[in-house]
Amino acid sequence: MLRFLTAGESHGPGLTIIVEGIPADLPLLAEDIDRDLARRQVGFGRGGRMSIETDRVTFRGGVRLGRTIGSPIAMTLENRDFKNWEVPMSVSPVDLDDEAVRAQLEAKRITRLRPGHADYPGAVKYGLADVRNILERSSARETASRVAAGAIAKQLLRQFNVHVHSHVVEIGGVGAGESVRPALPTFEEWKDLFERVDQNDLRCHPDLYERLRSRVVEAAKGGYTLGGAVELAAYGEIPVGLGSHVHYDRRIDGLLAGAAMSVHTVKAVEVGIGTAAARETGADVQDEFINAAGEIARTSNHAGGIEGGMTNGQPVLLRAYLKPLPTMRKALRSIDLVSREPFEAHYERSDTCAVPAGGVVCEAMMAIVLAQELQRKLGGDSLGEMLRHAGRTHA
C-alpha cells in the first residue's frame, strides 16, 4: 500500500521523496507532478523565496518509459538557493580555523526563539544550542515533497475517476460563512469551479477575489500575516466503503483529518458542515435518502460524504483552517535560548499569506489517504489488476 518518506532541509542541496506501493503500469510524467508544484508556488502574498525556487521534479527510480514499474519511486527537487548556503549547510565538516568560514556559520546561527515555530520544543527535544537545525526541517519548504507525493496519488485516483481539489474560502475573516458553490454540485459544476479557481493567484472563487486580495494588501502594508480556510473536495465516482467502522484507526474521517492537521499552520479541520452540526437539531443535519430513477441518492451532503467512518459515495468534503504565519516583519517578544536575554524574535523570510499554497498541500495529503484506502479495498500490484477488481475495463 502507498506510503512515502521525505528528506532534505530548507536551505540544503535539495529534497528527496520516495513513494512506495504505487501499482505498476500507472502512466506518470514529470509534468504531472510539476503542475501541482507550480500550483503550490502560486499565491498573492507569497514571499521572496517563490521567485528563487521554480520546482521541477527529477525521477531517480521507479518509472520507465512514462509508466511506473512497481518498485519505489524516487524523486528529487533542487534547492536553487543552496548556492548561497554551501558553507553553513555543508554536509561535510568545514575548516573552523578559517575566519571567513566561522563568520558564515555564526551569521546563520539562530538562538533567538521565534514564537509559533518549532524552535523551542525542537531545540529542547534534541538538545541543541542552535535552532538552525530545527528551522531547516520544520520549514514549509518540506511541503513541496508532500505535493510531489500527493500528485502521484492523484494520478492513481484519476484512473478511477476520483478527483481531488481545493479552493480558498476565507482569508483574514473575509469570506467567512459565505457559500460560493451549489449545495450539491454536479461533476461538471465541481470541474467548472476548480477551473475558475486555478485561474487566479488566490485560488478562490472569482466572486471573492477582490475582497480577499484587498485584505492581503492591507496586511502586507501593516507588516502582519493572515490565515484563512480552504475547502477540500474529492468528487467523481467516489466508492462507497473506503475506510471502516470497525476500529478507531480505520475510520476515514479520522485519517483525513489527521493528514490535514499535519500540514504546517493547519489548526482545525471540519468534515462536512463540521461545527455547524453542533448548533442544529438532529433532523436538520442528516442526509435523507431518496429514490432517484432507481438509484439511491441524498437530499443533501451535510456529512461531507462520510458516515460511520466510511465514504458513502457522495463527494468527500473537508474544510481546513490555517493560522496566520508566525514569522512577521513586526517582531514579537522573545528570549535568547542560550543567554536567556530578552530580544525581538529572529525574522526569517516569510509570506504575508500562504493559505492558497496550504490548500494545495492539504489536497496532496487528502489524495494520499484516499489512494491508500482505495488500494486497501481493491488490492492489486498493477493498475490493470486494480481496475479489474473495481469492475472497470479501463481508466
Curated annotation (Swiss-Prot):
Its cofactor is FMNH2. Pathway: Metabolic intermediate biosynthesis; chorismate biosynthesis; chorismate from D-erythrose 4-phosphate and phosphoenolpyruvate: step 7/7. It is an enzyme of class 4 (lyase). Reduced FMN (FMNH(2)). It holds the Pfam family Chorismate_synt. NADP(+) binds at R40, R46. One of its GO terms (cellular component) is cytosol. Keywords: Amino-acid biosynthesis, Aromatic amino acid biosynthesis, FAD, Flavoprotein, FMN, Lyase, NADP. FMN binds at R137, S138, S139, G308, K323, P324, L325, P326, T327, R349. HAMAP family: Chorismate_synth. Belongs to the chorismate synthase family. NCBIfam families: aroC, PRK05382.1. This reaction introduces a second double bond into the aromatic ring system. Homotetramer. This is Chorismate synthase. It comes from Gloeobacter violaceus (strain ATCC 29082 / PCC 7421). The gene is aroC.
